[in-house]
Every structure is written in structure tokens, then in C-alpha cells.
Design a protein with these regions (language model features):
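ABC family nucleotide-binding domain
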Residues: 1-185
Length: 186
């Protein structure tokens, strides 16, 4: 806690400015150019500790919303993509229920489906299992393992070391705002 891991994700997503250095996402530099920042945000999905689902909307409506607002998809197109992504994370049968009717693990899978429905090139995860009961952690990690097997580029802040070893190509260890060690999982 407090080592700067979440801040790094905010830098990558262009939500905070760096003091030095350069971040490149899919060949596009993340700099002071507002247009670049907006374009990069369209290509980056984010999974947070808290699920940030709208409580007054069904699961399907939550997953549809950003597709229709940001990607300008029709409701029909959004629904097709939403159902595909809800199926991918194993929760399509809950499309017409409200977030309060779901477990924490189910809500996190809906949040991941919502991010994936935007067809990001990179997924950022900020401790996606930290707010979950121990029995719910596995179902979220399984979804993330599937994404890794499919080749999704991911940056994941996690305390789940076994998971990190299993799915990572590269690991960064941080302490007190500094990168202490980097390398392959080997």
C-alpha cells in the first residue's frame, strides 16, 4: 500500500501527468496532446477495486452504456457485444438483474465485461480482487487467466503472487513509490 502501483495505472490511462519519461500505448505517445489522451483512453480498459456499476441499471444496461456513448454503437449492436462479453466472463444469465442482486465476484465480472465490450487493446486492473470475499477471488482470477491465454495485453496491480507468476511475462515490484525490481517471472 502506498508504493505507487495504482498511480502507474493512472499514468498509463492518461489520468495523471508524469514528471518525466514517456509512456507509449499501441504506438501512440501519451503526452500533453489532449487528442492523443482521448484516443488512448478509448483503447484502454480499466478494472477497478470497486466495480463502479450503476445501481439503477441492469447488468446489460451497465455493459451497453459506454459502447453507445463513446463508441456510438446502436442499442442492438451494443446488446450483441454485451451479451458476448457477459458470456465470456460467465455471467450472461444475469443480464437482466441489478448489481445489488449479484455477489462481489459477479459484479467484478460485469465490470470486466463492460471494459472488454469497448474492445480495448490493453486492460488495466487495479487490485481487482482486493474487495472480494476469498471464495469469490477465484472466479475473477479465472476470467483474467482466460484473457491472458487469449493474448490480451494487461497491466495488473495485484497482491496475488501465484496469479502474477502464472499469467505474467514481466513483473515489476514497487516499494515506496520506486521500482525496486523488474524482470521475467523466472
Amino acid at each position: 500500500s502506498g508504493s505507487g502501483k495504482s498511480t502507474v495505472l493512472r499514468y498509463i490511462n492518461g489520468l495523471e501527468n508524469t514528471d518525466d519519461g514517456l509512456i507509449v500505448v499501441d504506438g501512440m505517445p501519451l503526452d500533453d496532446n489532449r487528442k492523443n489522451r482521448l484516443e488512448i483512453r478509448k483503447e484502454v480498459g480499466m478494472g477497478f477495486q470497486s466495480f463502479n456499476l450503476f445501481p439503477h441499471m441492469t447488468v446489460l444496461e451497465n455493459v451497453n452504456l459506454s459502447q453507445m456513448r463513446v463508441r456510438k454503437k446502436s442499442k442492438k449492436e451494443a446488446k450483441t457485444m454485451s451479451m458476448e462479453m457477459l458470456d465470456k466472463v460467465g455471467i450472461a444469465e444475469k443480464a437482466n438483474v441489478y448489481p445489488a442482486q449479484l455477489s462481489g465476484g459477479q459484479q467484478q465480472r460485469v465490470a470486466i465485461a463492460r471494459a472488454l465490450a469497448m474492445m480495448p487493446k490493453v486492460m488495466l486492473f487495479d487490485e481487482p480482487t482486493s474487495a472480494l470475499d476469498p471464495e469469490m477471488i477465484g472466479e475473477v482470477l479465472d476470467v483474467m487467466k482466460d484473457l491472458a491465454r487469449e493474448g490480451m495485453a494487461m497491466v495488473c496491480v495485484t497482491h496475488e503472487m501465484g496469479f502474477a507468476r502464472e499469467v505474467s511475462d514481466w513483473v515489476i515490484f514497487m516499494d515506496e513509490g520506486m521500482i525496486v525490481e523488474t524482470g521475467t517471472v523466472d
